[in-house]
Amino acid sequence: MDTTYFGRKWGVMVLYDAISKRALSVLEVKNETIERYRQEVAALQERGVVIQSIICDGRSGLLQAFPDIPVQMCQFHQLKIIVRYLRKKPKSEAARELRALALTLTGSSKDRFIEGLHDWLMRHEAFLNERSVNAETGRSHYTHKKLRSAYHSLKRHLPWLFTFEDFPALSIPNTTNLLEGKFGDMKRLLKCHHGLKKANKIL
């Protein structure tokens, strides 16, 4: 499940079935909220839809919002987070190594990735924890803030990055790429009909 936006004023929230490859819920939204996702999942369950698992991005609070359903964080979204923090060509060796490790995520096993992240920390923990002092205020702060953010993002999301391994019988996808592809198709189609009113775009 995910939400895509068409401009700044409106978007579409979609809950998509990876097995039947059809949308179970399509909702016009102005803002993407955890409560709205909860409401839509509950509405589907009330209709008798059995939700075996959920694949979503790492939006704050969303991964923890469904304690009774296996939740897989989209590994592609995790990669985007790391690239946003570290860019394509990090300057420090620690950042280059962490980015390289993150790029193995989609092809790695849970145990191998956790081991790789632990080994990275053992090599670079001192660098990660370096502090600098502000000459004007005298206050200290972490020197490599973006590197810390990237590392802690991986560490924080680890419980949900390999849910598909924990429930092999469910054949859980490890990304929302199927839905992202549908969003891409929608946006390309709407570009061909740029003059349509919003109501017609939703239809």
Model-flagged regions — what are they?
Residues 49-60, 66, 99-203:
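Acidic/histidine-rich catalytic cores and adjacent linkers
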Residues 18, 41-44, 81, 89, ...:
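Short, charged/polar low-complexity linear motifs in solvent-exposed/disordered segments
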Residues 1, 23-26, 48, 84, ...:
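Residues at structural and domain junctions
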Residues 1-60, 64-68, 157, 178:
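RNase H-like nuclease fold core
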Residues 17, 32, 92, 194-195:
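A short hydrophobic/aromatic micro-motif that marks alpha-helical segments and, especially, helix-coil
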Residues 53-99:
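Conserved beta-strand -> loop -> alpha-helix junction used to position metal-binding or nucleic-acid-contacting
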Residues 17, 21, 46, 77, ...:
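Intrinsic structural disorder
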